[in-house]
Every structure is written in structure tokens, then in C-alpha cells.
Regions:
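Bacterial N-terminal signal peptides that target proteins for export
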Residues: 1-8
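Bacterial N-terminal signal peptides
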Residues: 9-16
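Terminal leader/tail segments of proteins
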Residues: 21-187
């Protein structure tokens, strides 16, 4: 019986810590005069190690991944690095692999944009760094690190492929995809 109580207490503590971590993502994100609402958030884990937490912010929350990918409207994905094991090269490599998955192996169609992405993500990555990938209609995907603009990549097609890393039918993490589409900040 005490073993069960210990497990329940550990789970309760974990739930509180996870709730607090997601609270750091914030329930909304202000872009200019527009306010985006947190659609859902989750954690990317690999081999039992939490790599980052990510939140999807939309003007009008929805669970329809295809509608989100196709939408030519303001939206954002926020990624907060939670592991000290993430480096610049591993982040870039992971995004490239995710783009290959998202595009069904047709990432070479976005060679120029991927080259731009590598140049934009030039700074080393540290634990607690926050990346915002903000899509602005007619202006492209703006990439911010810790609130500072790093660069932008033009095109709705690239936004679809990039957001597809998390939201396509072949995402980097199916549980994370489900969490980002859940309408809940905590899974």
C-alpha cells in the first residue's frame, strides 16, 4: 500500500512541475496588436530525456491540424529548451530531419529556405532558451530567440512544411502533436 502511495505522490508532484513548466509558455502571446491564444502544449522527449516543451498559439484555437497548416494567418510555435544536451547543431539537424518527415522526403524543394534557417540559427543553444517561430501573412516565418528577432524566411509553403515538423501526419513526436492540438496547456 505504501508503494502505491509513494507512486501517487510522485505522480502528483510531477503533474505540478509539468503544470508550472507549461505555465512558463504563457496562456497567450502578443504579436503587435494581435493576441494569440495557447492552443495546446506538450513536451518533446527522446530516450526518456525531456528535450523541450512546445506550445502552439493561434488567433482561433482549433484541433484541425490540416486547417492550421493551410491557414495563411498569424500564428506561432514557441519552443523552450529544457535540456542542457541540446546544441546548435543538434537543433538544426533535428529541424532538418523533421522537415524531411513533414514533406514526405521532399525537403530538397526547400533547400534555399533550409539554408536560410541554418544561417538564422547561428547562435549556440542553452537550457531555457526560448524560440518563437511566428508566421506573419505576406511576411513569412519570423524566428526569435529569447525575444530577439534572428531573421525571417518568406513563403506560406515553407511555413506549412516547417509547422508540419510538429503538426503533419508524420510529426517528430505524435504525443507532442496531440498535445499541441488538444486545446489544453497540460497533457
Amino acid at each position: 500500500m505504501s508503494k502505491i502511495c509513494s507512486w501517487l505522490a510522485a505522480f502528483a508532484l510531477f503533474s505540478v512541475l509539468v503544470s508550472q513548466a507549461y505555465a512558463e509558455l504563457g496562456p497567450q502571446l502578443k504579436i503587435g496588436e494581435q493576441v494569440l491564444k495557447l492552443n495546446g502544449a506538450g513536451t518533446r522527449t527522446k530516450t526518456f530525456v525531456q528535450i523541450y516543451e512546445s506550445g502552439l498559439y493561434l488567433l482561433n484555437p482549433t484541433k484541425d491540424a490540416r486547417a492550421i497548416l493551410d491557414a495563411d494567418e498569424l500564428m506561432a510555435i514557441r519552443v523552450r529548451i529544457t535540456s542542457g544536451f541540446v546544441s546548435r547543431s543538434s537543433l538544426v539537424s533535428s529541424l532538418q530531419e523533421g522537415l524531411a518527415q513533414s514533406t514526405g522526403g521532399r525537403a530538397d524543394e526547400f533547400a534555399s529556405e533550409i539554408d536560410q534557417l541554418q544561417k538564422i540559427l547561428k547562435e549556440e543553444v542553452k537550457r531555457n532558451d526560448v524560440y518563437d517561430f511566428v508566421y506573419v501573412p505576406e511576411k513569412g516565418l519570423h524566428i526569435l530567440k529569447n525575444g530577439k528577432v534572428q531573421g525571417a524566411i518568406q513563403g506560406l509553403a515553407f511555413k506549412k512544411a516547417f509547422y508540419g515538423v510538429w503538426l503533419s501526419d508524420t510529426p517528430v513526436d505524435k504525443d507532442l502533436r496531440q498535445a499541441m492540438l488538444s486545446g489544453n496547456a497540460v497533457r
